[in-house]
Amino acid sequence: MLLAKRSLISSDGIQMTKNRNLFYLFVIVGIFVTRVLFDVVNQIEVHFDEAQYWVWSQNLSLSYLSKGPLVPALIAISNKVLGQTYLGLKFFSYVAYLGTVITISLAAFKLTNRKESFYIALSLTALSPAIFILGGIASTDIFLFFFWSLTILCYVCFIQERDEKWFYFIGITTGLGILAKLTMVLLPLSI
């Protein structure tokens, strides 16, 4: 008697087995670990911008000079959980790097409905020098990339589904992006 593997149907109608989901999880964890190991192996020191955000995280406020409160708030949270460590400083930057890679890959998949597009976008985004380097620096830029790409993904979903709920998500992601870097305000104006 043949037993079929239990499969899951995603919202896009793509059939995924548990093994494939495990593979995706392995790839995502691999990208995250590679990014962290790059800093460890190359002994990347704390950047002066990161030191500035770390000081701000010790004295939280609604804004800092020309910067929003998101980065210092995230550093404060990670320092509470992970302590005053290198990983405590950079944890959310690594998460934003990973989120940017996944979000751009999902947008590519949604636009083409081809798995190859997802993997190509995943590879190119993960290895993009700007995103890769900024993914290891606790500054506003990687969060700008993350929320920018998340807003684009929400816009693609709106175009395809014509559901007004995506406008709320566009507003939320744009607002969070503005809390990271004011340049984010240009995205809705350009769409």
Cite the ranges covered by each PLM segment.
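Loop-to-helix entry region of an early transmembrane alpha helix in multi-pass inner-membrane enzymes
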Residues: P69-A73, G83-I102, L134, A138
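Transmembrane signal-anchor helices characteristic of membrane glycosylation enzymes that use polyprenol
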Residues: R20-V46
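Extracytoplasmic catalytic/substrate-binding loops of multi-pass membrane glycan-assembly enzymes
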Residues: D39-Y53, S63-I77, G83-L87
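Short helix- or helix-capping micro-motifs
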Residues: I28-I31, F118-A126, T174, I178
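Membrane-interface alpha helices of multi-pass inner-membrane proteins
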Residues: N59, A121, W166-L182
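Short acidic/glycine- and proline-prone juxtamembrane loop motifs at membrane-interface regions
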Residues: A130, G136-L144
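Transmembrane-helix signature of polytopic, membrane-embedded enzymes
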Residues: Y24, I104-L127, F145-F146
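Membrane-interface transmembrane helices that cradle and orient dolichyl/undecaprenyl
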Residues: F109-K115, T151-W166
